[in-house]
Amino acid sequence: AQVSQALGGVEISEEDNVSKVLTAVAEGSCEVGTTYYSDTYGYEDKLDILQVVSYDLTGDVIYPICQVQNDEADKTQTAAAKDFYKFVLSDKAKKVFDAYYFDTDIEK
């Protein structure tokens, strides 16, 4: 309520998750919301991005990847999991992530 008042009474969507906020703003059921930049992919014609918050305020948003140990997996499944893991870390995958607004230019 305080933020809404500070912005002149603008309705702010407070949803369960940022995807719901994005949908509410895109559909026009609220005027403004905060979401991940990567979630805006495909909504460019329905949204005006007002501000991209810098990493010094938010910190890096990290999506970890790992391979779990699965004693029930056969050799083919285990090899496929390892191949997928390697692909996700590859330059080719980084280009895909970048195309969908994920920033891959971070320190490891």
Predicted region positions:
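Exported/periplasmic ABC-transporter solute-binding proteins
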Residues: A1-K108
